[in-house]
Amino acid sequence: MAPQEQAVSQVMEKQSNNNNSDVIFRSKLPDIYIPNHLSLHDYIFQNISEFATKPCLINGPTGHVYTYSDVHVISRQIAANFHKLGVNQNDVVMLLLPNCPEFVLSFLAASFRGATATAANPFFTPAEIAKQAKASNTKLIITEARYVDKIKPLQNDDGVVIVCIDDNESVPIPEGCLRFTELTQSTTEASEVIDSVEISPDDVVALPYSSGTTGLPKGVMLTHKGLVTSVAQQVDGENPNLYFHSDDVILCVLPMFHIYALNSIMLCGLRVGAAILIMPKFEINLLLELIQRCKVTVAPMVPPIVLAIAKSSETEKYDLSSIRVVKSGAAPLGKELEDAVNAKFPNAKLGQGYGMTEAGPVLAMSLGFAKEPFPVKSGACGTVVRNAEMKIVDPDTGDSLSRNQPGEICIRGHQIMKGYLNNPAATAETIDKDGWLHTGDIGLIDDDDELFIVDRLKELIKYKGFQVAPAELEALLIGHPDITDVAVVAMKEEAAGEVPVAFVVKSKDSELSEDDVKQFVSKQVVFYKRINKVFFTESIPKAPSGKILRKDLRAKLANGL
């Protein structure tokens, strides 16, 4: 009997340790065996003998192809050279890179070494990069020569080793930096060094930064066990939830420094032996050309890219018929956009997933992507992944809710984070004593087990899928001598989804202008954190506790102020 025929609605009333009765939601797909005792790299390359000579990484702009054997060998060589450079087990390597094959090779090398990879947006300001590097105790940074000026103080003051991936001899490598090609050189003790590394499933392999439900960016500790579990939940089993296979060509235009691309494109693609087509940034004509030339079959996207494609007349010039899956994440996709995408990609299944960095990151995924698919509804962001539990709770009482009742989404399973780095208080606020991770998102599960996102409790602003923490911008703004109080909230915007706007209380007799405020922030942050609008106000609404009442400010925006 096929897995789909065996599958039944696996919602059940379950006795919890401390709750009289929790309504637990599970996947329609049966649980599977997950070998999460393996290190991440051993799991990823477990079946390499089946596709050693197949394309693994395709550099979109250059066309250069790395086979699976190439990637395996080079990653191990880099790991051995990490060891030579003094990177020890559990040390942190920062990847300050756009999408490129070197990102993948370096991430895997960190895993082989028993080190931890943290990734940062190369467009971050020097202060933003330094904050993450110091908080994570980064020992080595892999980047491009053009970004070295931003991180020179880390080299000079903290002894951080800098490696540049530029392989063109015409590009001079800044003084004191190493070339990436030096790390890829074979070393006689490579196998001995790497094979002697003993990795615990609970060791941290990835350290993405996330603001969580509130506050400033924090290091999210994702373990070997957690990432193996998350990837397996998606692509393993006789009827995988996300059906990737070794003949697929998977587009990777979403930033690899974001957990969505790192996990659901890079790691999932590697696990099944697919070819991963890497684009350093979104350029619609190049993207369409590469889809046609490389016969891309899977196109993971975020709503702003979906919107750009939906509105573009350029699509008519290209053959996009090879695409069988369009997967959207990072923010809900509306019905109009769904219809537009279906028109542009006539042979593609369109569906959504729902994730959060702290959850590993995937909580739910469309069962329309399964090898033996289930019917799905427009607007749903999937069904809870297998080998995990989900519940919906009343945000005020914490009581478990049943179907069709909106509440806070909670997830439990081996895939969730170990915790926030050096922040037990924030960890305890996010993961309760029974192991449930509280997302800060409001959703409901309907009669067909499909999850719908209704609202957001958390303060986070999502600009084209990027996280913007209001608290981070407020901390900057309150440092301005002419600002006495401030609150930052999200405002809806078609192209970006959401943009940050500031409500500002000026000091008495100040002549502070909107442009003054915008420029003050823009000099200190990456482009997507810039303030879009400034509203001057007499006071900021606050609860008796002093907490900003953001919902009141969002209501003002919704009512046109």
Curated annotation (Swiss-Prot):
> Where on this chain does ATP bind?
S210, S211, G212, T213, T214, K218, Q352, G353, T357, D441, R456, K547
What does this chain do?
A: Produces CoA thioesters of a variety of hydroxy- and methoxy-substituted cinnamic acids, which are used to synthesize several phenylpropanoid-derived compounds, including anthocyanins, flavonoids, isoflavonoids, coumarins, lignin, suberin and wall-bound phenolics. Follows a two-step reaction mechanism, wherein the carboxylate substrate first undergoes adenylation by ATP, followed by a thioesterification in the presence of CoA to yield the final CoA thioesters.
Query: What tissue specificity does the UniProt entry give?
Result: Preferentially expressed in roots, bolting stems and siliques. Also detected in leaves.
Q: Which UniProt keywords apply?
A: ATP-binding, Ligase, Magnesium, Nucleotide-binding, Phenylpropanoid metabolism
Q: Which residues bind CoA?
A: K281, K464, G465
Source species = Arabidopsis thaliana
Instruction: Present the record's domain note.
Output: Both substrate-binding domains (SBD1 and SBD2) are involved in the substrate recognition, and are sufficient to confer the substrate specificity.
The major lineage groups are: Eukaryota, Viridiplantae, Streptophyta, Embryophyta, Tracheophyta
Protein name per Swiss-Prot or TrEMBL: 4-coumarate--CoA ligase 1
List the GO molecular function terms: (E)-caffeate-CoA ligase activity; 4-coumarate-CoA ligase activity; ATP binding; trans-feruloyl-CoA synthase activity
Any matching Pfam family: AMP-binding_C
Q: In which pathway does it act?
A: Phytoalexin biosynthesis; 3,4',5-trihydroxystilbene biosynthesis; 3,4',5-trihydroxystilbene from trans-4-coumarate: step 1/2
